[in-house]
Amino acid sequence: MDPKYFILILFCGHLNNTFFSKTETITTEKQSQPTLFTSSMSQVLANSQNTTGNPLGQPTQFSDTFSGQSISPAKVTAGQPTPAVYTSSEKPEAHTSAGQPLAYNTKQPTPIANTSSQQAVFTSARQLPSARTSTTQPPKSFVYTFTQQSSSVQIPSRKQITVHNPSTQPTSTVKNSPRSTPGFILDTTSNKQTPQKNNYNSIAAILIGVLLTSMLVAIIIIVLWKCLRKPVLNDQNWAGRSPFADGETPDICMDNIRENEISTKRTSIISLTPWKPSKSTLLADDLEIKLFESSENIEDSNNPKTEKIKDQVNGTSEDSADGSTVGTAVSSSDDADLPPPPPLLDLEGQESNQSDKPTMTIVSPLPNDSTSLPPSLDCLNQDCGDHKSEIIQSFPPLDSLNLPLPPVDFMKNQEDSNLEIQCQEFSIPPNSDQDLNESLPPPPAELL
């Protein structure tokens, strides 16, 4: 229960107690002068035409105030039996023949009984108390304080109302019914204002509670996340195995370390460039430099055929440099791999077959052999010179064969054609079994 309501109830109860205490004091002061409204039966019978009857068939009750005195019957139209006349404990007033009023406020109104004297007497409509007074025993008059109720009983006119003051004053007791407490007027306004305040307070409390709980949940989540997160391992071998570690860290340990490492993607700036240098271009540059140096050492520049051979060899070496891996010179076993030339006994048959087939068979390199290298210019010149000398020596003396001498131009053309065919189709595969450290043979005297 709200404390405001409790305080308000206590305050109203205090006011109620003070109000009824004042009424009790007023009744004690006025007990010395009670007013009793009586009339004689003779006067009532004399004015029998003015007497009123109960139209609803309800009996009227009489109250005997003193011996030999009674009150005239009253007419009541409310449908309730009228009690006998009794003295009011608060402020009784009566209309007499002189025009003095008598007023008493009750809660329920009762209709007026019309008589000729216009004198009002007020009774209670709910209960039927009887006030009886005697000289020996004072009666207890039950007084119910109500508001907004009026009734009037008229007594015959032109008769003086006698007021008797008995020697023994009756004691009046006031009974406060539980329904007599006035209603609280402030309840209507207070009930309208308190629900709004309660709503605002509840909304504020809910918001504060939600904020506090959300903060606690967030703190707990952050703490758990930091505790459950795995610590970062400080790997000393993040860059791989050290080149200076001579077997100190075995490969098994390295494998375990690499498995535990988190795979990270690493990209270099070179991958973003549009052109990347390849090994083939580098090897081609090396071969061009070596060929240029070897060409400077050659003194035999008078022969145009040799220059033509150099140009052809340079073109073939540059074309084949893309598939090569190492630019080194050919081994010294090039001469041993060449088959000997066939004996040229029939010159006429040789002349007829020169244009169709070459005179010597050449071994072609394997396509899958990655170690096949082009021969250098020095080796080609040396081989060409050797074959030339062998071809010259293979011819028998002209005198022994008894053949006519061939013309000089024919001999030169034959030699030139043989050299061109041999040099163009000459490619020697290196011997993998031969030792590369074997010394090369000295160059021929013609090249020097």
Swiss-Prot record:
Induction: Up-regulated by full-length CEBPA. It is a single-pass type I membrane protein. Keywords: Glycoprotein, Membrane, Phosphoprotein, Proto-oncogene, Signal, Transmembrane, Transmembrane helix. It is found in: Membrane. The modification Phosphoserine is found at S268, S271, S278, S294. One of its GO terms (biological process) is positive regulation of granulocyte differentiation. Residues 74-108, 298-372, 427-448 are annotated as: Disordered. Residues 22-202 are extracellular. Residues 1-21 form the signal peptide. Residues 97-108, 313-333, 350-372 have a biased composition (Polar residues). Bone marrow, peripheral blood mononuclear cells, fibroblasts and Epstein-Barr virus-transformed lymphoblastoid cell lines. Strongly expressed in granulocytic cells, and weakly on lymphocytes cells. GO terms for cellular component: plasma membrane. The modification Phosphothreonine is found at T249. The chain crosses the membrane at residues 203-226. It comes from the Eukaryota. Residues 227-448 are cytoplasmic. Glycans are attached at N16, N50, N114. Required for granulocyte differentiation and functionality of hematopoietic progenitor cells through the control of cell cycle progression and survival of hematopoietic progenitor cells. This is Protein EVI2B. It comes from Homo sapiens (Human). The gene is EVI2B.
